Amino acid sequence: MPVHSRGDKKETNHHDEMEVDYAENEGSSSEDEDTESSSVSEDGDSSEMDDEDCERRRMECLDEMSNLEKQFTDLKDQLYKERLSQVDAKLQEVIAGKAPEYLEPLATLQENMQIRTKVAGIYRELCLESVKNKYECEIQASRQHCESEKLLLYDTVQSELEEKIRRLEEDRHSIDITSELWNDELQSRKKRKDPFSPDKKKPVVVSGPYIVYMLQDLDILEDWTTIRKAMATLGPHRVKTEPPVKLEKHLHSARSEEGRLYYDGEWYIRGQTICIDRKDECPTSAVITTINHDEVWFKRPDGSKSKLYISQLQKGKYSIKHS
């Protein structure tokens, strides 16, 4: 069978070679046909055997797979039951308080509880001690304030009483002057005759202007006493008399000026540390907090505050100095 190609030259060159090859291959093709017919018959028998074998093996595989699935399910159920029994046993140990997983954290918690309880007890004692100290400081400050107020009240009452005594003494001296008039008046009354006596006094003839006193002698005496008291109190020519009770003089120089305290030639300001000395008591140190017109507030080392009156410094009941 001729082969058509793109060029004619190519067809002529290969024509002879194809004839030679065809003659050689003709003998071999007959042999191949015989072998192929025998192999086809053998392949038909083997294919039937392969199908049966595959079906058989497929069934075996399915059976084996089902067995494996059943075994896996059984193992899974068994493992679940074992794990459940282990968890139940561990839970019973925890409930009974014997599991090490429970005992170790429990011991740690108990140790922490003991430490915190101990710390809380120490803190409680410190708080109680602090409250007790504050209470004692308040009591001490209240007592000192009461003593200061008592001394101030005593000084005030004493000065008022001394002033009253002085005025009474002045009144007594002024009354002594009028008492002589009172005695003279009484003596003159005694010397008078009885008004019911038959002897009558002759009328006095007065020439020129005259004043008729319509007041009684006792009223005139009372008016005279009142005038003498007013003159002794407000008159420009007041006669000063020494009172019987000597007033307490200022032994020390103390005053307050523009927020500063002057005492015995030294100046004190707020914030300075001073030493307070009182008779029959130990000296104490304090810090000046406030300086008013007539009092000085200071703070003691224990935190309590007290005040000191400038009049007490003047009278020498207290003395201060720079610390």
Swiss-Prot record:
Main location per UniProt? Answer: nucleus
Question: Where is the protein situated, by its record's location annotation?
Answer: Nucleus
Q: Where is the composition biased (Acidic residues)?
A: 18-53
- Record's GO cellular component terms: nucleus; Sin3-type complex
What Pfam family does this protein match (any one)? Answer: Sds3
Claim: Ribosomal protein is one of the keywords in the record: no
Q: Where is this region: Disordered?
A: 1-56
UniProt-listed PANTHER family: BREAST CANCER METASTASIS-SUPPRESSOR 1 (PTHR21964)
> What is the role of this chain?
Involved in the histone deacetylase (HDAC1)-dependent transcriptional repression activity. When overexpressed in lung cancer cell line that lacks p53/TP53 expression, inhibits cell growth.
| Quaternary structure note | Component of the Sin3/HDAC1 corepressor complex at least composed of BRMS1, BRMS1L and ING2/ING1L. Interacts with HDAC and SIN3A.
Protein name from the UniProt record: Breast cancer metastasis-suppressor 1-like protein
